[in-house]
Amino acid sequence: MKILIPTAKEMNTDFPSIEAIPLKPESQAVLDALALYSASQLESFYKVSAEKAAEEFQNIQALKRQTAQHYPALKLFDGLMYRNIKRDKLTEAEQDYLENHVFITSALYGVVPVLSPMAPHRLDFLMKLKVAGKTLKSHWKAAYDETLKKEEVIFSLLSSEFETVFSKEIRAKMVTFKFMEDRGGQLKIHSTISKKARGAFLTALIENQVQTVGEARRLNFAGFVYREDLSQPQGLVFVKEV
């Protein structure tokens, strides 16, 4: 069983770095394509300020020169979902669960264990980077599928931009999750609810060592409970009354 989570734009490097590992050929090809951009070209590519673009340029060049600082991916990313994941004071069993079951899907690194070393970078599958004439999704599809082809159960906490990198055959094995709030009988869903709930849900999976869909249905976390009436066999819905 594998659990897939996305990367995040927000990052935190305020903790000790760890040793890097060599880039996969697919990752090196992406980096080579990114490294062709000047700082001013990155400004329009990323749709960010000149200051941000200059920072990203330095990050890319540091990776290219193999001088970039690397950090465990789970701690490097610091978006809303990540801030709601239990990342410290893990028991040995929780650490093992993380290492064996939780994987990050990255447009630069591929599908990798959640504690893998990553350097600060900015890239997602909505960005129009061409790698040897291919889109990022086309470039990564075979490698993404290869990582999961032997898995029977895949829990996806990904957005559609990441899920659609995988083939239909792999996506058919995915169990997806939706998190909603019940406000006086009105069911609401929005980005902030979803991101926080994904982090809390992953924490519950880790703490309860969940291995099956049945075990996931029984979870009660951060006020969310499973709603069978709203769910499908491979699309579970959790609702929080507020």
From Swiss-Prot:
UniProt-listed InterPro entries: YaaA
- One GO process term, biological-process aspect: response to hydroperoxide
Q: What stretch or stretches form a coiled coil here?
A: none
GO CC, one annotated term: cytosol
Q: Which family does it belong to?
A: Belongs to the UPF0246 family.
User: What NCBIfam families is this protein classified in?
Assistant: PRK02101.1-4 (NF002543)
Per its record, how is this protein called by name? UPF0246 protein SP_1547
Organism of origin: Streptococcus pneumoniae serotype 4 (strain ATCC BAA-334 / TIGR4)
Tell me the lineage of the source organism: Bacteria, Bacillati, Bacillota, Bacilli, Lactobacillales
